[in-house]
């Protein structure tokens, strides 16, 4: 009994001491400074923080510049980039894809491409020393044979891998007529797959090898082919190209977007332009004007992204300005900034980005592919201007409801592109393409949570039939730990941070056990410093890594947003939320009064490829700290009109 009393006294002391240590003046100070930073970063009525994939894509770009004859006009500076690679190489010789503070070694494909670039321009002793270390590391990881299929496709285009050792992509999957409508791949794969697949299919069909000076990589093989790399380009008729090839070319041209991209991505655009280069060399009388225009526009698009004013040389994948603007507008509005001052920014975004009777695109050149996640949080922003957008709001809500999958959850771009096409799922796995990208666009809990949050701002509640289906989806997909695997952010921490606030906005009873399980998950995963963090390896080995990693400000904000919805349930939750808020303040000071993520927090392709989203650190901490401040001052609204999983009213207050 004596030990129990001592434990209770110590526990109460800890709770009270941490509560008292969160200085609300410091909270407001951090909020004000971040608001000022955000105002200083507005350009042309948008916030723009390009997401990036890492330097390996700039290494690739060096070779693509040679193919496209752009070296004389590109902003690429070989001296600068070479020094950058030498400085970022790990001691073991590897390079990371994007920054990950939880790992002390790199990624194989990134290391192969960076090695290849350095070997191709090798002009000083420092490079040779870096190559020796990298070569040893690559071979230890299994060599070129162990790289992803996408890497092998790119190596094959430069004679470093045999096309015949890669699976053939049949061209009939790009046909729509007759019986082929059942195998038309555009209607089956995710939006982000198709513009890459069309170009890869072309290069594989032609077995294209570009005749440009590149370094030989035979030393990176474990078992280099006895007869060398087989170079066997397909025979062709200049005047009479294959009809299937022309159908593929027509499909590719349909992907061209207003700013010059093919599909809105830098990588798909470069692969497409390289395909055009090959096609033009074989059939110079066809598509002359279209291809010339594609070169001109494509050059602008790629250079704009790869050497932009904010993330130059980081390998920016695309333009995501509407997503960035949504997030930061939301953060600024919620934290009390002047609505009228922000209105021109929101008005511009709605005018330029929101598609009529649909959703909003992720950024420039995504007009053809509205994004449900972005649209869900756009609703939150538009809720501050209901009168100004009284026409757009109901149309946007109607579109969102139309995009719900049969399982109750939400995809990113396309309804009905779950993994239930077993034939294509098997084919992509057999071809090895599934080891380079996510092929389908299934429902995901993070998007579904954001959409619930947006709909909740317009009075939709947990008794609405479609929202009941969303809740059933969340319950069904919850894992044994009480969390979910997130699709677009790392990872189980992010999912709880999206699901719980979404449930709260639609007045769902957060006392239900399955929701409590997700809160308990967070309590068990909080780091000693008060923050939350999670390594990207949680996708590859969830049993070991779920919810584990060094703290970041964005992941801490996600965790805090969930905890705040149940802040008054008990002292343990209060204590955890206080610690998370204190971590944000401490990290803000450590990073010279800025919010910055020291690890990758964005997901491109789970377990394969990751994206860093700089805008997350400019927005989520601001939302989380503002809500924390309001709760601490008794100003945060908790709903009393609650519903259970059957959509029935709950006769008790949530907290």
UniProtKB/Swiss-Prot annotation:
Application in biotechnology: Expression of THC1 in Saccharomyces cerevisiae enables to eliminate anaerobic sterol requirements and provides valuable information for the design and construction of robust, sterol-independent yeast strains for application in anaerobic industrial processes.
Activity as a function of temperature: Optimum temperature is 30 degrees Celsius.
UniProt key word Repeat: yes
GO cellular component: lipid droplet; membrane
Top EC category: lyase
Reaction catalyzed: tetrahymanol = squalene + H2O
Keywords linked to the UniProt accession: Glycoprotein, Lipid biosynthesis, Lipid metabolism, Lyase, Membrane, Repeat, Signal, Steroid biosynthesis, Steroid metabolism, Sterol biosynthesis, Sterol metabolism
Name assigned to this protein: Squalene-tetrahymanol cyclase THC1
Name of the gene this protein is made from: THC1
């Amino acid at each position: 009994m004596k030990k129990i009393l001592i434990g209770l006294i110590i526990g109460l002391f800890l709770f009270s001491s941490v509560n008292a240590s969160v200085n609300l003046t410091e909270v407001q100070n951090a909020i004000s400074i971040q608001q000022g930073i955000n105002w200083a970063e507005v350009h042309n009525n948008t916030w723009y923080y390009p997401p990036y994939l890492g330097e390996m894509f700039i290494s690739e770009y060096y070779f693509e510049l040679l193919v496209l004859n752009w070296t004389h006009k590109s902003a690429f500076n070989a001296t600068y980039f070479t020094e950058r690679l030498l400085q970022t190489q790990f001691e073991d010789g590897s390079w990371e894809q994007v920054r990950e503070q939880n790992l002390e070694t790199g990624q194989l494909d990134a290391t192969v491409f960076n090695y290849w670039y350095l070997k191709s321009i090798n002009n000083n002793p420092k490079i040779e020393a870096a190559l020796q270390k990298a070569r040893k590391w690559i071979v230890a990881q299994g060599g070129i044979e162990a790289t992803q299929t996408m890497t092998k496709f790119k190596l094959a285009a430069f004679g470093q891998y045999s096309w015949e050792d890669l699976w053939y992509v049949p061209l009939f999957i790009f046909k729509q007529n007759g019986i082929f409508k059942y195998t038309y791949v555009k209607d089956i794969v995710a939006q982000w797959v198709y513009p890459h697949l069309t170009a890869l299919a072309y290069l594989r069909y032609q077995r294209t090898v570009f005749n440009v000076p590149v370094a030989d990589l035979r030393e990176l093989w474990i078992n280099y082919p006895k007869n060398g790399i087989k170079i066997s380009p397909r025979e062709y008729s200049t005047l009479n190209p294959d009809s299937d090839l022309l159908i593929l070319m027509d499909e590719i041209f349909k992907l061209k977007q207003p700013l010059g991209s093919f599909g809105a991505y830098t990588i798909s655009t470069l692969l497409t332009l390289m395909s055009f280069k090959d096609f033009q060399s074989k059939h110079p009388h066809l598509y002359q004007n279209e291809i010339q225009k594609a070169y001109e526009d494509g050059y602008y698009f790629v250079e704009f992204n790869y050497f932009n004013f904010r993330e130059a040389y980081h390998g920016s994948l695309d333009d995501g300005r509407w997503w960035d603007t949504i997030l930061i507008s939301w953060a600024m509005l919620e934290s009390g900034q002047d609505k009228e001052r922000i209105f021109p920014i929101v008005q511009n975004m709605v005018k330029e980005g929101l598609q009529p009777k649909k959703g909003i695109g992720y950024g420039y050149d995504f007009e053809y592919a509205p994004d449900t996640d972005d649209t869900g949080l756009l609703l939150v922003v538009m809720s501050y201007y209901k009168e100004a957008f009284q026409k757009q709001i109901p149309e946007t809500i109607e579109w969102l409801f139309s995009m719900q999958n049969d399982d109750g959850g939400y995809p990113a771009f396309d309804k009905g592109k779950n993994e239930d096409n077993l034939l294509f799922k098997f084919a992509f796995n057999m071809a090895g393409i599934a080891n380079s990208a996510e092929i389908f666009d299934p429902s995901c809990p993070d998007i579904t949570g954001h959409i619930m949050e947006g709909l909740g701002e317009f009075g939709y509640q947990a008794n609405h039939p479609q929202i009941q289906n969303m809740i059933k989806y969340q319950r069904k997909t919850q894992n044994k730990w009480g969390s979910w695997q997130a699709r677009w952010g790392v990872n189980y921490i992010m999912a709880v941070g999206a699901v719980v606030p979404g449930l709260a906005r639609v007045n769902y009873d957060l006392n239900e056990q399955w929701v409590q399980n997700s809160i308990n998950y967070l309590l068990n995963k909080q780091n000693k410093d008060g923050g939350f963090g999670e390594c990207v390896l949680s996708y590859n080995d969830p049993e070991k890594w779920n919810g584990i990693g060094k703290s970041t400000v964005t992941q801490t904000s996600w965790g805090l947003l969930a905890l705040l919805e149940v802040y008054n349930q008990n002292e343990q939750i209060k204590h955890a939320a206080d610690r998370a808020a204190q971590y944000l303040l401490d990290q803000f000071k450590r990073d010279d009064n800025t919010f910055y993520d020291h690890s990758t927090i964005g997901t491109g392709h789970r377990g394969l490829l990751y994206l860093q989203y700089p805008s997350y650190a400019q927005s989520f901490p601001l939302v989380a700290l503002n809500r924390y401040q309001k709760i601490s001052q008794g100003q945060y609204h908790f709903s009393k009109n609650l519903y259970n999983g059957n959509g029935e009213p709950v006769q008790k207050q949530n907290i």
